A protein has these predicted regions:
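Short, motif-level signal for alpha-helix interfacial/capping segments enriched in acidic residues
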Residues: 4, 65, 114, 302-308
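Transmembrane and membrane-interface helices of multi-pass
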Residues: 19-21, 28-276
Length: 350
């Protein structure tokens, strides 16, 4: 061949090699951008969860014991524990979008509807999470415990519950905080989705077996990390609420628990076989048998096995008073360092 022709062929081969390398780099960069898109949303969601926990920490009128009151390191540990639990919920939500973008990257398919679906998915599930987190603030303030499956008992009294929530002015701030968080997150997710879609779509190119292998390996590692985040720990059992307990203070121990996580786990626990309502025999048959054994007909409106007791002598009118204090903590007693004098009679009996 003529030297000039040979040189032109060599230049053509070199250009093709450079183009192929650039295409491979673009494909890897596309998947990297997809991962960056998911990571940013993940971090933004964790910041919102941190905000809800901070509001709960500052809004609860709680008196720390003297040994914890000025121990900021111990108080900060609750927020670190909270990040751990928040990440579990965020990984639950992250898993499906991560798998979808992994599959679309392997197929070199980047469609607008994919990012639109992922945006709606994030907005829907994080909105639900923020509603639960916002509801946890007044719930914790009233019951001194993280929101759990007991709230389902109120669903049968929808009108009464709504009236109680909307009629209490102290609940307005958590409601406002939840709505603002949903709006801010929705706007952020939509903007990020639009930005990364155009950024990834502008780099569209062909895909080679080597590219697929690299994307498959990177995606498998990321999905493995996400599943590990859902599990929460390397021990035999996955993360549990008890992992948040690290001190003797009941408030700090519960502060680290994510409300969504606690509601989810308590609901699952209620539906376990060993916790379900036992149907050993028909209820009416059991009542009839007990009435026959006890020789009672019961008192309507009180109990089917109740009986009326009539005193033969003159009653002495003595009373037995029982005091039940729901979610009462020993730290609120003067004996354990409280200066509020909330329970003077209980303190005198201790």
């Amino acid at each position: 061949l003529h030297p000039r022709v040979r040189r032109q062929r060599q230049m053509c081969i070199r250009d093709r090699s450079v183009t192929a390398c650039k295409n491979q780099a673009k494909l890897i960069q596309q998947f990297t951008l997809s991962l960056l898109y998911l990571l940013i949303i993940h971090i933004v969601a964790l910041l919102f969860f941190f905000l809800f926990r901070l509001v709960l920490f500052t809004s609860i009128d709680y008196q720390f014991p003297p040994d914890i009151q000025n121990n900021f390191l111990m108080q900060a540990t609750a927020f670190i524990k909270g990040l751990w639990f928040d990440n579990v919920i965020a990984c639950y939500i992250l898993l499906l979008p991560l798998v979808i973008l992994w599959i679309t990257a392997l197929c070199n398919y980047h469609s607008k509807w994919v990012f639109r679906f992922i945006s709606i998915f994030f907005i829907l599930f994080y909105s639900l999470s923020f509603i639960i987190s916002a509801a946890n603030i007044p719930y914790f303030s009233y019951f001194f415990k993280t929101i759990n499956s007991s709230i389902y008992n109120w669903f049968g009294y929808g009108a009464t519950t709504a009236g109680m929530v909307l009629g209490e002015t102290s609940f307005y701030f958590p409601i406002f905080l939840g709505l603002i968080s949903i709006l801010l997150l929705s706007g952020s997710v939509l903007r990020l989705s639009s930005y990364f879609y155009h950024l990834i779509n502008s780099k569209s190119t062909s895909i080679s077996p080597i590219n697929r292998l690299c994307i498959f390996a990177a995606g498998a590692v990321c999905i493995g990390l996400c599943l590990f985040g859902i599990r929460g720990r390397m021990g035999y059992n996955p993360i549990r609420v008890s992992q948040a307990y690290y001190c003797t203070d009941p408030f700090l121990n519960q502060l680290g628990v994510n409300p969504v996580f606690n509601l989810l786990t308590s609901t699952l626990d209620d539906n376990r076989k060993e916790n379900r309502y036992l149907h050993l025999m028909p209820e009416q048959e059991a009542i009839t048998n007990m009435q026959s054994i006890l020789q009672r007909k019961g008192i309507e409106g009180i109990s089917p096995i109740a009986r009326e007791v009539k005193c033969a002598a003159v009653p002495t009118q003595k009373n037995v008073v029982l005091i039940f204090m729901e979610s009462m903590s020993a730290n609120l007693m003067e004996h354990f360092g409280s200066t509020e004098k909330l329970t003077p009679f209980l303190d005198s009996l201790y």
